[in-house]
A protein has these predicted regions:
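Charged, well-structured alpha/beta interaction segments
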Residues: 1-12, 66-68, 75
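Internal catalytic or translocation cores that form aromatic/hydrophobic pockets or channels
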Residues: 55-84
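Short, glycine/charge-rich flexible loops or terminal/linker lids adjacent to PRPP-binding catalytic cores
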Residues: 17-56, 70, 98-101
C-alpha cells in the first residue's frame, strides 16, 4: 500500500483510536488508465466493517489533483453509503483538477508541476517526504 495507508495506520495507532481502520486499493477506480496503464500489483481492499451510516475519516499523504480522493470515495460507496466522510491529508500541494478539499491539513506547500512529492517509510517507521525529480528532502518525522 501507499503512503496514505501508512499514515492512516500510524495516526490510528498513535492516537489510540478504538474504531476500525481499513485500507483501500483504488487501482481499479482510477481514471488515468490510458496514461499510466493498469497496475500489475493490485492489493486487496481491507474493509472489515460496515461503512453504511458511519462517519468515516479518509486519510491520504499528499492531496494534489483530487483524483485519488475521488477514486477512494467511489470505492467506499461500493461498500455502502457513509453518513459522512472527512478528509485528512499530510500535505496539500494545490493543483486541484476536481472540487475536492481537505477538512484537516498538516502542511500546505507549493511544488512545481513537474515534481512529485512522495512519502517514504523506513523499517522502523520513520517517515520522510522526498521530491522526485528533485534533490531536496522536504520534511522528516518519526
Amino acid at each position: 500500500h501507499s503512503g496514505g495507508a501508512w499514515l492512516a495506520q500510524r495516526l490510528h495507532d498513535d492516537l489510540g483510536l478504538s474504531g476500525a481502520c481499513g485500507l483501500l486499493d483504488i487501482s481499479l477506480y482510477r481514471d488515468d488508465f490510458d496514461q499510466i496503464g493498469l497496475h500489475t500489483q493490485v492489493m486487496p481492499t481491507q474493509i472489515d466493517f460496515p461503512v453504511a451510516g458511519k462517519h468515516l475519516i479518509l486519510v491520504d499523504d499528499v492531496l494534489y489533483t483530487g483524483r485519488t480522493i475521488r477514486a477512494a470515495m467511489n470505492e467506499l460507496f461500493d461498500h455502502g453509503r457513509p453518513a459522512s466522510i472527512k478528509l485528512v491529508v499530510l500535505i496539500d500541494r494545490g493543483g486541484r483538477q476536481l472540487p475536492i478539499s481537505a477538512d484537516f491539513t498538516a502542511l500546505t506547500v507549493d511544488i512545481p508541476l513537474h515534481e512529485n512529492l512522495v512519502l517514504q517509510r523506513n523499517k522502523v517507521g520513520v517517515f520522510a517526504l522526498h521530491l522526485e525529480n528533485g534533490d531536496a528532502t522536504c520534511v522528516t518525522h518519526n
